[in-house]
A protein has these predicted regions:
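Sec-dependent N-terminal signal peptides
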Residues: 4-12
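Sec/Tat signal peptide C-region and signal peptidase I cleavage site
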Residues: 14-18
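Low-complexity, Ser/Thr/Pro/Gly-rich disordered linker/stalk regions
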Residues: 19-177, 182-302
Length: 302
């Protein structure tokens, strides 16, 4: 009888902590019609010791399934030439194949941060990012900050800036649609970046959208925490809280009409914007300060 009970406990425990296979995640994304956004693998720096880093969820806005990411305290990993653990980082991300620059690309994401999401600001939290290679440097990030969802033309490649896309009051507990269009072109007279949030134009940038060394780039998304010591210092703790996000309807195409229907494309392309809400990031701000958001003209983005 005792052996039988132990066996049952083992089976239940094994099922509870079984890791989701990459093939299951890819299948769920494919069912939503991912277009050219074909995932390659789990990021190699996702911790193999993580409890439930990436899983398929029945909570969805597109189709029947979404992808759930979870990051817990201490879930970091290393490779021969780099260690997230030794560099103040934790991550759980999906990784995509390298693609060439100077190509017009349209991306769509639906993200959901729970109402009770544990913000780690002022530490950095990247939800979506593109990196160029040789050298490996960030181009663009969609981040979660004290100001909410922000668009970051990253300081690795451009003049660092944070445009507020959606405040926390509207972001948390609601699905958010992100549509991002760029051509990853390094020339200032040819490059562009546009961002629509829930169908509303938030960024319309004309200028360099890459560097001369960015011939190849790749997408990764999920939860990428960095500079965690800032959170620990500000809140006097050594433990990072659990972080959870859902992604759904992830898709990439070469034109708007392939990404979404033509009527919606016309509505998106007919919009214009004259000013942005710029977030002035403070490394050790405990909360959003009144003077941390400034309205500036759209040509202020460099």
């Amino acid at each position: 009888m005792r052996i039988f009970i132990i066996l049952i406990f083992f089976l239940i425990s094994s099922n509870t902590f079984a890791k989701t296979k990459f093939s299951e995640v890819r299948k769920a994304l494919k069912e939503d019609g991912y277009g050219k956004a074909i995932p390659e693998k789990f990021h190699h720096l996702n911790s193999p010791k993580a409890i439930n880093p990436v899983s398929v969820s029945n909570f969805s806005i597109i189709g029947n399934k979404s992808i759930r990411f979870e990051s817990n305290n201490g879930e970091c990993w290393q490779e021969p030439k780099w260690s997230d653990c030794e560099n103040d980082r934790e991550r759980t991300e999906l990784y995509y194949k390298k693609k060439p620059w100077k190509k017009n690309r349209w991306y769509r994401f639906y993200i959901y941060l729970p109402k009770d999401y544990n913000s780690i600001a002022p530490a950095k939290m990247s939800l979506i990012q593109w990196k160029r290679h040789k050298p490996s440097k960030v181009l663009v990030m969609f981040q979660h900050t004290h100001a909410g969802l922000t668009f970051n033309r990253n300081g690795d490649s451009f003049k660092d800036s944070h445009v507020v896309l959606k405040p926390n009051e509207e972001l948390l507990g609601n699905w958010t649609e992100i549509i991002f269009n760029t051509n990853w072109h390094p020339k200032s007279d040819k490059g562009h970046m546009k961002v629509w949030i829930d169908g509303n134009l938030k960024v319309d940038f004309k200028g360099a959208s890459n560097t001369k060394k960015g011939k190849e780039l790749s997408l990764r998304y999920g939860l990428y925490s960095s500079f965690m010591s800032r959170f620990k210092t500000v809140f006097d703790t050594q433990t990072m809280p659990q972080r959870v996000i859902f992604f759904d309807g992830v898709k990439e195409e070469t034109s708007c009409e392939k990404l979404i229907d033509s009527d919606k494309c016309q509505k998106l392309m007919s919009q214009s914007i004259n000013e942005y809400d710029f977030y002035l990031y403070g490394k050790y701000d405990k909360k959003l300060k009144i003077n941390s958001i400034m309205k500036l003209s759209s040509n202020s983005l460099k």
